[in-house]
């Protein structure tokens, strides 16, 4: 870890009412003496002159000094809050850099220092960037929950439970005569099952948090002329796609990024799925399946004038059978203005079925509410947290090792192999909070932060 003292502008570049310069490190006190002529009382606002090396006043403002470790970074921190003109702030940074041993901070380096000094774990540090980058109220609330340690708490509890069970298993291994009795008495199995169940709950919450942060990818799929492009236009609120009566009008993937009450939604319109000899249409259909395979949700668009069926297995079994196993599907029966169907949503064998008219807008608002619900929208979000793709991947790895450990226990009563799977699960979970994380990953994470954060 570097011991350099760093400086950067903490407020956004450009013109503003207030501009803040942040200094962190051992030389922060030297900067205070050079620029202010004195060291402010820790944690007190001090109105004073900011001076250059000749004693001329550069600006006037508030100086705040935080004595380490009682600061955001865990080091001595000095903040100079002056007027927000960029020229003035640049002059002030230039003055600070005249003090020996000071350099400009790299992106995210203040947060990295806080992480290295155990002021934040990795999920909390990431939550700072997520809070700044939040594009909706839901995302901001969830990022704040993560910053306050909600996600970390869940992960730490899992790590503690896995560690405790691992120690119990390894203790049994140390007494080989009793090992089989230990492994078969049910206590280890029950503890393992509880951990797997808890991890499943955390995975579901993290998946929801990832959708809130990154948005949900929804693919509209179905046969040609079912009204897919009309639905895209209805959801987007504009004419994004060309709509005609000619089957196969859409031959490529069309994308729209919208917000439903602040929740980010990525809508993908695809070519109608059918057997065709048209080379261009075949390429479009291949791209459609690529989008479907990476979707968070599929809206299975059905022309209601062609079938009365509501169970997707009855409507088009080959399509449903080809979908990824865990991909959620919502059946959308279109052209309700022609069929006269009741617009009420129904559940059919685990599938939500909506009746709409993409052309007239009938039922589209109810479908939007459904999508918001899938994304975890709540008017008053409590207890949720934000998550990133790397968190989901780490949770998946941990779950995989726990399942392998379960097999070693139930089938082979293999204590050493169970202990190894528990160790691997522990490592995967610890990567989330940064307890065991490679330097390359840390560099990648913090380099995506703003300078000054």
UniProtKB/Swiss-Prot annotation:
Gene3D superfamilies in the cross-refs: P-loop containing nucleotide triphosphate hydrolases, Probable tRNA modification gtpase trme, domain 1, tRNA modification GTPase MnmE domain 2
Cellular component terms (Gene Ontology): cytosol
Residue positions binding K(+): 225, 244, 246, 249
TrmE-type G domain segment(s): 215-376
Matches recorded under PROSITE patterns: G_TRME
Record: residues binding (6S)-5-formyl-5,6,7,8-tetrahydrofolate: 22, 79, 119, 453
SUPFAM superfamilies xref list: P-loop containing nucleoside triphosphate hydrolases, TrmE connector domain
Cellular localisation: Cytoplasm
A Pfam family hit: TrmE_N
InterPro entries in the record: G_TrmE, GTP-bd, GTP-bd_TrmE_N, GTPase_MnmE, MnmE_dom2, MnmE_helical, P-loop_NTPase, Small_GTP-bd
Key words of the record: Cytoplasm, GTP-binding, Hydrolase, Magnesium, Metal-binding, Nucleotide-binding, Potassium, tRNA processing
Biological process terms in GO annotation: tRNA methylation; tRNA wobble uridine modification
Recorded family membership: Belongs to the TRAFAC class TrmE-Era-EngA-EngB-Septin-like GTPase superfamily. TrmE GTPase family.
Quaternary context: Homodimer. Heterotetramer of two MnmE and two MnmG subunits.
Physiological role: Exhibits a very high intrinsic GTPase hydrolysis rate. Involved in the addition of a carboxymethylaminomethyl (cmnm) group at the wobble position (U34) of certain tRNAs, forming tRNA-cmnm(5)s(2)U34.
Protein name: tRNA modification GTPase MnmE
Organism, as annotated: Shewanella sp. (strain MR-4)
Gene: mnmE
